[in-house]
């Protein structure tokens, strides 16, 4: 985008719903409550009473898989599994973890995020900026520690003398073992799941996200060296299309993978 035509910084100033990109935090909460990567859970039709009405979440592909593992539920981004997890674990626990990861959740009011749909499927009231979502994923990439984003690491003068150092705060959000297991699960998103188009050909982990009406598409991912987020969307929040084709999170993943390959050209491959 041309800054002269539009000075809006979409990385830091525009909030959009994260969709399924919120799910790793739900699954992390599940691990903390005793679930394991191979724990069985049934992908089936479920109904919940929400604001006096029955709500039945749908899977993006319209099918039900029966009994699957927790990992498969994340890798294939199964909505019914995410909703069941929030309902079982408890809205308050998932809400707290999302807040600790840095998501700007709305706690009260007519519209708030203390509900199954906002927490399980990412239909957040205010949404998130790409920077906020990237920062939330640092809890997975940094073994449970959330890193505060900084615009610079150091400032030097013309002679190389240090003038100022960027302060990067960090705090523990997840136990080390939870972050480790989440990374292993999220690696499979890129090798056999919804993010396979973004596989950069080296160890990487991440998650896709798409919102209702195909108005926003996300991919948030990381390697041992770098974490990056791709957001696709229009300023008027209209559906994503290009050349008559619908764009989705697969396209976001593909762009992410291309960036990672270029950014890490010549960097030795290493595992998590």
Regions found by a protein language model. Name each.
Residues 13, 80-82, 116-118:
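Short, solvent-exposed beta-strand edge segments and adjacent coil->beta transition regions
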Residues 84-85, 123, 206-208:
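Thr-Gly-centered strand-to-loop micro-motif
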Residues 1-12, 17, 22, 72-76, ...:
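A penicillin-recognizing enzyme superfamily signal
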Residues 54-59, 90-135, 148-151:
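Mid-domain, small-residue-enriched loop/turn segments at the edges of structured enzyme/sensor domains
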Residues 41, 110-115, 197-200, 271-272:
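Short, glycine-/polar-rich solvent-exposed loops and beta-turns at beta-strand/coil boundaries
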